[in-house]
Amino acid sequence: MDIREIALEFCGRGGKRLRPRLCKAAFERCGGTGDIGGVCDAIECFHKASLIHDDIQDGDEERYGRPTVWKEHGVPVAIAAGDWLVAHGYRLITESGFAAMPQMIRAAVLSHVRLCEGQGDDLLGSSHYQLPATSYQLPTTNYQLSTYVSVCERKTGEAFALAAQLGALAAGADDAPFRRYGLAYGVLFQINDDIADGANPAPLAELKREYEDKTALYRDECAIGVW
């Protein structure tokens, strides 16, 4: 297998494909015409690339019931496979044929910058923000909670925000409300994920309610419905 085959094989493994589905829902809600499939595939490539790199950083050995890419092929190959998926995602956007392609590329670039910064702050959190190494021991001070939200927005929120944003841009619509919805949904997704993974729900309860309200408000603003 070459890097392309390793990357695409992993990209085709499990997952709910929530981000591509959100991209498609935003595109359809905005009355888009044309084939959004390539852009949805790009969103999934970006997501799966982040999982490959996350598994290396976290030392996780299994995903989707199978060995992670680094465990199966080694760290250097896994890094290259993740990088290839990012590059392939950009190629898919450039080949999508939408008039807003330059704006879509710019949105993806800015989103990736924020995502990398959020991931970096999460990894450096213990020393940089005086946070514990994982959010599962999340303390309750306002400063630390605000830092947690900032990391969630950039790590997870950005991925959902970009998905909704690209769908709206491809349809020639105003992407701002869709970005707001995706960002709020992504933070709520991360909060729920952290609680499911064993975080103490008590310090997150109020934050969860806040983002449930934000998600509902922005979803209604977009009239995007259930996707």
Residue ranges and their predicted role:
Residues 1-227:
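All-alpha prenyltransferase/terpene-synthase fold signal
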